[in-house]
Amino acid sequence: MLGLRTCFSPAFYLAVVLSEIKKKVRLIQGIASTYPEEITDVEEGDVCTVFSFPRFYKETVNIAHFMRRRGAKVIIITGKDIRPVKPYGDIIIPCSAVGPSFKDSYVAVHFLIDYIISSIAAKNKDEGIEVVSKIEEILSQNYFIGF
């Protein structure tokens, strides 16, 4: 998953929830501009979901372009104007909800994320059960108070 600046929130949410049902889910965080170190092992067969909304951050499309050149499928979730990001993705999903603020709302984006997660979970039940079992094993090691 990739989402920089204001797009980090939906990317983080998708990565966390998807990692509860799929193995090998990674979030490119780019803390201290460590993008190169985080994407060195991208290869053919990988899929990267990219969140990019206006104002389009150039670093986001640069990273998406690199991953696509390495053979990864790039899915870009963006606003209603897909033209700025269209050259960088294999699949472009426009998703927009105009809000009362100067920025569009991410409500529709989170709805789309929940739909994607539900679809993936339905198609990967066995893997999801295995991943959840491993997560529960770790969490049972005194992570919570009073349970």
Identify what each model region corresponds to.
Residues 126-147:
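A short, charged, Gly/Pro-tolerant segment at domain boundaries
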Residues 1-111, 117-123:
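Glycine-rich phosphate-binding loops that contact phosphosugars or nucleotide phosphates
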